[in-house]
């Protein structure tokens, strides 16, 4: 019986600690947030372009390696 009573208190204590932690956290300003979003977007775009370029280069190389000269 006492274990059943402790579970909700554990959960409420955990939620209370989460609320206290989130209140103590320093949140970024709007300018910092927009700058961070722009940098992440540029990084993701760069990785996409890099992946596309690597794929574009390796497809012809793979076709040259895989294809045999006797087949037509």
From Swiss-Prot:
Keyword Endoplasmic reticulum among UniProt keywords: yes
Entry's transmembrane regions: 41-61
Bilayer topology term: Single-pass membrane protein
Gene3D superfamilies: Preprotein translocase SecE subunit (1.20.5.820)
GO biological process, one term: intracellular protein transport
Topological domain ranges for the Cytoplasmic compartment: 1-40
Subunit structure: Heterotrimeric complex composed of SEC61-alpha, SEC61-beta and SEC61-gamma.
Record-linked PANTHER family: SEC61 GAMMA SUBUNIT (PTHR12309)
Physiological role: Necessary for protein translocation in the endoplasmic reticulum.
Name of this chain's protein: Probable protein transport protein Sec61 subunit gamma
Organism for this UniProt entry: Encephalitozoon cuniculi (strain GB-M1) (Microsporidian parasite)
Lineage: Eukaryota, Fungi, Fungi incertae sedis, Microsporidia, Unikaryonidae
